[in-house]
Amino acid sequence: MSGTAEFPGRIPAPYLEVGSSSFVELLGSVAPELLPGRRPLPPGDMGDAAPHGTTIVALRCNEGVVMAGDRRATQGNMISLRDIQKVFPADAYSLIGIAGTAGLGVEMIRLFQAELEHFEKLEGNALSLHGKANKLANMIRGNLGIAMQGLAVLPLFAGFDTDAPDAASAGRIFSYDVVGGIYEEREYDAIGSGSIFAKSALKKRFQSEVDATEATRLAIEALYDAADDDSATGGPDLTRKLFPTVFTATADGAKRVPDAEIEAVSRAVVAARLENPGG
């Protein structure tokens, strides 16, 4: 750090000021150009200038919540990436998945992770799950300008509510619109270009009493159906051994479902569809 002219190497004053516990607000005051929504862009629609991530699904289960995402990113009518990861742990008990402009989405996830960690370090306690969801809504509002130029990012947020009376009611799912509106979903939700097909699949198959293993299978079934009708969504790729990314958030924390388990479930789903293509 440059410090000041009087005391070279000293921490700059903005870092020592007492403010909020928000890392995003701190970054906005000391280096606003690093925030995605503050970067200058040329006029016009830039939606086809970068790869886009597609379909994410989340559903509640007896132990908490399951979130899954396909691995494809597209740019216009081309497949730009076949193995992108679009679902991540936000912190110890919550998950985030992104659809929309892939690069900005991954950057938003990293910034959101830093925001939650920064708050916990300063306050000594983690935000409530709803507080985390509201933090994410504020970040989306900050990106409204570039979203209007075709570089929108829409996340899906879910987690295990440690304040819930029991595990069966602890799984919560939050969706957003492009202006930062936040909506809690009761049972399941999906975002991205294949979301209408994924939600239709879950509407037929979802039951209120499912464990995490069954919820994982339902999520993969939903992504398979989305890929069947939406060219921007990638289904299980048996040839390349590329399968959906799946995370769970339970009382044990946010964990990735092992790749070997996802491969076994994906192969079982594909084999079943050979017998009954419509599921």
From Swiss-Prot:
It comes from the Bacteria. It is found in: Cytoplasm. Its main location: cytoplasm. It is an enzyme of class 3 (hydrolase). One of its GO terms (molecular function) is threonine-type endopeptidase activity. GO terms for cellular component: cytoplasm; proteasome core complex, beta-subunit complex. Transmembrane segments: none annotated. The formation of the proteasomal ATPase ARC-20S proteasome complex, likely via the docking of the C-termini of ARC into the intersubunit pockets in the alpha-rings, may trigger opening of the gate for substrate entry. Interconversion between the open-gate and close-gate conformations leads to a dynamic regulation of the 20S proteasome proteolysis activity. Residues 1-53 form a propeptide. Its EC number is 3.4.25.1. This is Proteasome subunit beta. It comes from Stackebrandtia nassauensis (strain DSM 44728 / CIP 108903 / NRRL B-16338 / NBRC 102104 / LLR-40K-21).
